[in-house]
C-alpha cells in the first residue's frame, strides 16, 4: 500500500492504483498540451496536433492494461501464498489442474504437485496468462478475473447512469480505438478519422471509474485516515 496526503489526513492506496494515477497524469498532460496549442477554438486542429490525442489514447489504455495485470497478479499471488491447501483456492486450482491433465502427464510428474509444488504450477499459469494478455478488453478481463479473482469483475462495473453492459461496451470501443491508432496511426489522405478531444476526455473518465469499481469489489479501495 502507498500513502498520500489529503486535506484532513492520509489516504492509503495500493501501489497499483498510484502507478495508474501517475500514468493518467501523463494522459491529462497531453490533453493540456493539445488545448494550449489550440486555445480550445472550434474547428479541426492542425494535423500535427493530432499526435497528442493519439498518444493520449495509447497511454490511457496502456495504463489500464498495466492496472489489470498488476491487480490480478498481486491479488492472485497473495491468495496462493496464503492458501494452506488447494481447496482454499479451489476454482483456480481446478482450472489449472484440468489444463495440466489434458496434457496427459506421466505418473512420475504427479510428484511435482505434492507438498507445496502445486503453488508453483498456479503461479506459472498466472504469469503465462498475463503474458498472453494482448488486449485488456472486457472479455479478457472477464476470463482473468473469473479464474484468478473468483468472480466476474465486469458484472460489478457500474456507477451513476452507467450499467455493467454499457461500461463493457465503452471499454471495448476504447480498446478498438487504441487498436486503430496503433495499427494505422496517421495515414495518407486521412483515411482514418481523427480522434476527437471528447473521446480522450471520455476515456479518462471511463478508466478512472473502472479502476474505482475494480478496487472496491476486491476490498482495495483507498482508505482515508484522519491524523
Q: Each predicted region: which residue ranges?
A:
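Charged alpha-helical initiation segments
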Residues: 1-58, 72-75, 81-82, 86-91
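Polyanionic, low-complexity intrinsically disordered segments
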Residues: 3-36, 151-227
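Intrinsic-disorder-associated interaction segments
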Residues: 9, 13, 20-23, 65, ...
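Solvent-exposed, non-transmembrane amphipathic alpha-helical segments
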Residues: 40, 44-47, 83-99, 191-194, ...
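Generic hydrophobic-segment detector
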Residues: 46, 50-53, 107, 140, ...
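Short runs of predominantly hydrophobic/aromatic residues within well-ordered alpha helices
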Residues: 53-60, 64, 68, 72, ...
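Helix-loop junctions and short alpha-helical segments
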Residues: 59-60, 67, 71-162
Amino acid at each position: 500500500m502507498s500513502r498520500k496526503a489529503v486535506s484532513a489526513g492520509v489516504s492509503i492506496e495500493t501501489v497499483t492504483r498510484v502507478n495508474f494515477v501517475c500514468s493518467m497524469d501523463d494522459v491529462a498532460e497531453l490533453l493540456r498540451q493539445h488545448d494550449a496549442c489550440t486555445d480550445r477554438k472550434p474547428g479541426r486542429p492542425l494535423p500535427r496536433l493530432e499526435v497528442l490525442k493519439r498518444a493520449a489514447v495509447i497511454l490511457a489504455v496502456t495504463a489500464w492494461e498495466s492496472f489489470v495485470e498488476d491487480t490480478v497478479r498481486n491479488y492472485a499471488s497473495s491468495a496462493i501464498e496464503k492458501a494452506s491447501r488447494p481447496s482454499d483456492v479451489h476454482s483456480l486450482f481446478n482450472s489449472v489442474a484440468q489444463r495440466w491433465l489434458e496434457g496427459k502427464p506421466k505418473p512420475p510428474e504427479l510428484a511435482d504437485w505434492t507438498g507445496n509444488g502445486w503453488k508453483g504450477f498456479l503461479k506459472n499459469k498466472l504469469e503465462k496468462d498475463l503474458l498472453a494478455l494482448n488486449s485488456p478488453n472486457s472479455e479478457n478481463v472477464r476470463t482473468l478475473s473469473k479464474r484468478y479473482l473468483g468472480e466476474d469483475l465486469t458484472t460489478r462495473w457500474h456507477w451513476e447512469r452507467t450499467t455493467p453492459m454499457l461500461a463493457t461496451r465503452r471499454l471495448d470501443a476504447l480498446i478498438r480505438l487504441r487498436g486503430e491508432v496503433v495499427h494505422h496511426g496517421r495515414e495518407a489522405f486521412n483515411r482514418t478519422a481523427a480522434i476527437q478531444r471528447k473521446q480522450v476526455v471520455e476515456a479518462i473518465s471511463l478508466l478512472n471509474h473502472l479502476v474505482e469499481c475494480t478496487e472496491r469489489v476486491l476490498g482495495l479501495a483507498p482508505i482515508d485516515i484522519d491524523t
